[in-house]
């Protein structure tokens, strides 16, 4: 068995110095990434509203000739609606979504068909980081520059 020498290991001062260096580095790095979570949530909601959910709604419309009604909602993308107009050619699920259709902040995506802003099809939006319908921070499909 080997014996420990007094010179083996680290002194308390050395350990405190290492902890201080790590804390200083963390204090410099963490603020740089703190705002990234909000940006990532906005990007995810934008992708849902303008791409993935929108594409699923368009596939539903191609198969059935109409978009789901407001009452049928986004659930019509994962299960065939039983409320009128009952789709005769439903080929879903159009999205593989477990649970509800919630944005990254935990609020349900809002879907209206026919839409107020998009009267030819539907309005789809997230209430955004604020979680209110006052228009502040909403992520919508009616201000989508790629939609014509």
Residues of each region from the PLM?
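Hydrophobic single transmembrane helices highlighted by the model
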Residues: 11-15, 36
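Stable alpha-helical elements in mature extracytoplasmic
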Residues: 49, 70-73
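Short, structured beta-strand/loop micro-motifs enriched in basic residues and often containing a Trp
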Residues: 88-94
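Short beta-to-alpha loop/turn elements within the nucleotide-binding domains of ABC transporters
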Residues: 10, 28, 72
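Short, surface-exposed interaction loops/tails
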Residues: 2, 39-44, 51, 55-58, ...
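N-terminal leader/signal peptides at the extreme start of proteins
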Residues: 1-10
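Alpha-helical hydrophobic helix detector
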Residues: 16-32
